[in-house]
């Protein structure tokens, strides 16, 4: 198990060939310059496998770093956490959509954050709790390092899992606070 000593090392990963036509590869990005995060899930035969959960760094040379991060897998769906219109991170969304437009068959979807609540701190706390519960479910809790800043990887993981569960019409109580199916917005 690799810890997050380097900004682009994986928190959790599994080996997989770049092309596996009988599965769906879902990637979710929690957008940000200093603390972006990516989760990659494989959905195959009604089961979910965690391929990768990574903390990334796009603080400098961001075009090259994002392109490298996008080129590691062949995704069928890419989920991007929606950003406010005037956010400096909107440029990342447009870059990712443009990069994948001609180079990939992936469907790119901007989605609302999974958790809603009274305060930013409360939302982040609930996101980390749901993430750790899922890590227990997948038997990967021991792979998660003790860190104070897990909210970014938690947010990316929860984006991906909510998408999978919605496709299967499955309710998961921590995600129920968002309006069902209304979280997907086109940019």
From Swiss-Prot:
InterPro entries with a match to the protein in the record: HJ-resolvase_A22, RNaseH-like_sf
Pfam families: Pox_A22
GO biological process: DNA recombination; DNA repair
Cofactor(s) listed: Mg(2+)
Molecular function GO terms recorded: four-way junction DNA binding; magnesium ion binding; nuclease activity
Assigned EC number: 3.1.-.-
Keywords: DNA damage, DNA recombination, DNA repair, Hydrolase, Magnesium, Nuclease, Phosphoprotein
This protein's record includes keyword Calcium: no
Cofactor binding note of this UniProt entry: Binds 1 Mg(2+) ion per subunit.
Function according to Swiss-Prot or TrEMBL: Plays a role in DNA replication by cleaving viral DNA concatamers to yield unit-length viral genomes. The concatamer junctions contain inverted repeat sequences that can be extruded as cruciforms, yielding Holliday junctions that A22 protein cleaves.
Family, per entry: Belongs to the RuvC family. Poxviruses-type subfamily.
Protein name as catalogued: Resolvase OPG149
UniProt source species: Vaccinia virus (strain Western Reserve) (VACV)
Phylogenetic classification of the source organism: Viruses, Varidnaviria, Bamfordvirae, Nucleocytoviricota, Pokkesviricetes
Gene that this sequence comes from: OPG149
